[in-house]
Amino acid sequence: MSLPTEVETYVLSIVPSGPLKDEVAQGLEGVFAGKNTDLEVLLEWLKTRPILSPLTKGILGFVFTLTVPGERGLQRRRFVQNALNGNGDPNNMDKAVKLYGKLKREITFHGAKEVALSYSAGALASCMGLIYNRMGTVTTEVAFGLVCATCEQIADSQHRSHRQMVTTTNPLIRHENRMVLVSTTAKAMEQMAGSSEQAAEAMEVASQARQMIQAMRTIGIHPSCGAGLKDDLLENLQAYQKRMGVQMQRFK
C-alpha cells in the first residue's frame, strides 16, 4: 500500500459516512495527485464543511498543509491551530513535547506510527499542533505516521463506544441512544440538503424525524416501544438513503 493510500485510509476512517465523506475522499485524492494546489481554497472549503468535528478538520488541515507543494510558508489557520491544541490540557502538551523528541529520531512512516500509538489522541493532536505551528520539524513520512496513529486512536475509541452502546443490556440506554442517533441524523440531513436536488424531500424527512423524537420525549414512550421508532423512521431514512447515498446501517 502506498503512503498516500495509507494516509487516506486512516483519515477517512474518522469521517462520518455520507456524501461529505466522498467529498473529503476526492479532496484527499486530488491533493495527493498534485491536482489541488491552492491551499487557501482547500482550507476555506474544509472550514465550512458541516458535520466534521473540529479535530477531524484540524487533522485534514494538517494533511493538506503538509502535502500541497510550496505552501508551507502561508499563514497558519486559526481553526486548525485550535483543533490541534490538545483541548488546552497542559498534560497533553507535556506529552506532545516528549513525543516530538522521539519522532525527531525516527525517519520512517511505520517507525513514527509505532512510537506515536503509545500516546493518547490528545497528546498526538498537540504534537501535530507543534509541527503545524512551526515549533518543530519532522520529515513528511514521520508526520504522516503521526497522523495515522492519531486517526487509529480516534477510530478505536469510536468503535469501542459504539460496541458498548450496541451491547448494553439496559433498555433505557438503548432506547435513548436510538432516539439520539435518529435526531443526529436528521440534523445531518438538514445540513446537507442545501445544495441537493432532493433538498425539499430531505428537509421534510428530517422534520418528520425531529417531530417524532420530540413527541416521544415529551409524552414518555416505554423502551419496549422502541421497535416502532425504528420501523417508522427507518422507512423514511432509507428512502432518503437510496437517493443520497447516506449510510444508515447503524440503525438496524
UniProtKB/Swiss-Prot annotation:
Q: Name one GO molecular function term.
A: RNA binding
Keyword RNA-binding tagged: yes
Specify the protein's topology with respect to the membrane.
Peripheral membrane protein
One GO cellular component this record assigns the protein to is: host cell nucleus
Segments carrying motif Nuclear localization signal: 101-105
Region annotated Membrane-binding, chain positions: 1-164
The family database entries (Pfam families) matched by this protein are listed as: Flu_M1 (PF00598), Flu_M1_C (PF08289)
Q: Which UniProt keywords apply?
A: Host nucleus, Membrane, RNA-binding, Viral matrix protein, Virion
Recorded hits in InterPro entries, A to Z, give:
Flu_matrix_M1, Flu_matrix_M1_C, Flu_matrix_M1_N, Flu_matrix_M1_N_sub1, Flu_matrix_M1_N_sub2, INFV_M1
Query: Which region ranges are annotated with the description RNP-binding?
Result: 165-252
Mind listing the GO biological process terms from this record? Answer: viral budding from plasma membrane
Q: Where in the cell is it found?
A: Virion membrane; Host nucleus
What's this protein's family per the entry?
Belongs to the influenza viruses Matrix protein M1 family.
What additional remark is attached to this entry?
Most abundant protein in virion. When expressed alone can form virus-like particles in transfected cells.
Query: Per its database record, what is this protein's job?
Result: Plays critical roles in virus replication, from virus entry and uncoating to assembly and budding of the virus particle. M1 binding to ribonucleocapsids (RNPs) in nucleus seems to inhibit viral transcription. Interaction of viral NEP with M1-RNP is thought to promote nuclear export of the complex, which is targeted to the virion assembly site at the apical plasma membrane in polarized epithelial cells. Interactions with NA and HA may bring M1, a non-raft-associated protein, into lipid rafts. Forms a continuous shell on the inner side of the lipid bilayer in virion, where it binds the RNP. Determines the virion's shape: spherical or filamentous. Clinical isolates of influenza are characterized by the presence of significant proportion of filamentous virions, whereas after multiple passage on eggs or cell culture, virions have only spherical morphology. Filamentous virions are thought to be important to infect neighboring cells, and spherical virions more suited to spread through aerosol between hosts organisms.
HAMAP family with a match to the protein in the record: INFV_M1
Q: How does it assemble?
A: Homodimer and homomultimer. Interacts with NEP. Binds ribonucleocapsid by both interacting with genomic RNA and NP protein. May interact with HA and NA. Cannot bind NP without genomic RNA.
What protein name does the entry list?
A: Matrix protein 1
Whose protein is this, by species? Influenza A virus (strain A/Swine/Iowa/15/1930 H1N1)
